[in-house]
Amino acid sequence: MSTSERPPSPSSMAEDFAVEPLSPDFGFYLRTTELLAERHSPVQHIEIVQTPLFGRAMRIDGCFMTSEQDEFFYHEPMVHLPAITHGDPRQALVVGGGDGGTAYNLLRYPNMERVVLAELDRDVIDMARTWLPKVHRGAFEDPRLELHLGDGRAFTGNCKNQFDQIVLDLTDPFGPAISLYTRDFYRACRRALKPGGVLSLHIQSPIYRSPIMARLLASLRDVFGVVRPYLQYVPLYGTLWAMAMASDSADPLSLSATEIDARLTQNGLIDLKLYSGGTHHALLNLPPFVQTLLSEPAYPIDDGNSLDDINLDPREAGKLKLIQT
């Protein structure tokens, strides 16, 4: 056990409420019953908490990342929509994703030969490995998984035409992850992809974080020929969430529901909880208010740009408390 990790104590097991702001004006709370583990790594604060609703959940710098009960709401559309669109991914890169859930879903493809997990913080992997087996499901023991500890941007920049699929499974765009949300980094991802390769990432919420969502899409569209945003409600995130798939040629809108279901069956993916041929197109079918949002001018994000006006960092919100009446 790391000296910076503390085990549960009687005081940490008392019922509590974790409050997470989504904007300066809105947030949500989640009841927690036990602090299972906690570390202050060199780059961030990591917690594993027990919750009645979601089971074990991971928080990083005050933001919920994943949980045992609802991880599929995030991991399945993030991985399988682009993978099925590609058709036969064999080499994949995950930037971030230290909980192992994305790697597990990629490794489910029988033709997958290699998955590289580039994670900045070894403590995230260690804590997930110990406390979240229902999320990673043994992915860290798969011989096809290759761990790279360190700067994911630097690693990606040294790759060229190596990967069929890249998944940016990142924390929110503040703190150590900020440099992974720029047009410059997306250019590095494009160079790292093979022809026909696919990229996916989450792009925040169209409801409470629409300015950053619009700018992220503008950044992607300046680099890739095909960019398709899609939507999924993630219970642990407290709101409607957005993701995007980008490629030079592969287009998720080109496949029928029948073709998608056939590819899922061919890969033995018959037990998914969310993603299917039917939900594929539902995810991509944006409501009018989102289409309007994305039709408005937005500026790409470049290295050195300040995102202070978007005000995403919950650490800047001050001490929040839940007031019960």
From Swiss-Prot:
Q: Where are the transmembrane segments?
A: none
Question: What's the EC number here?
Answer: 2.5.1.16
Q: What keywords tag this UniProt record?
A: Cytoplasm, Polyamine biosynthesis, Spermidine biosynthesis, Transferase
Q: Offer one example of a GO biological process linked to this entry.
A: spermidine biosynthetic process
* Binding locations of S-methyl-5'-thioadenosine: 44, 119, 151-152, 176
Question: Which cysteine-cysteine pairs are annotated as disulfide bonds in the entry?
Answer: none
Q: Where is the active site?
A: 169 (proton acceptor)
Superkingdom to which the source organism belongs: Bacteria
Single GO MF descriptor:
spermidine synthase activity
Q: Which PROSITE patterns match?
A: PABS_2
Q: Does the keyword Cytoplasm apply?
A: yes
Pfam families in alphabetical order: Spermine_synt_N, Spermine_synth
Q: What is its main location?
A: cytoplasm
Gene3D superfamilies on file: Spermidine synthase, tetramerisation domain, Vaccinia Virus protein VP39
Pathway the protein contributes to? Amine and polyamine biosynthesis; spermidine biosynthesis; spermidine from putrescine: step 1/1
Segments forming domain PABS: 11-248
What does the UniProt entry say about where the protein is found? Cytoplasm
Q: Which GO terms describe its cellular component?
A: cytoplasm
Please give the family membership noted in the entry: Belongs to the spermidine/spermine synthase family.
The name of this protein is Polyamine aminopropyltransferase
**Which source organism?**
Nitrosomonas europaea (strain ATCC 19718 / CIP 103999 / KCTC 2705 / NBRC 14298)
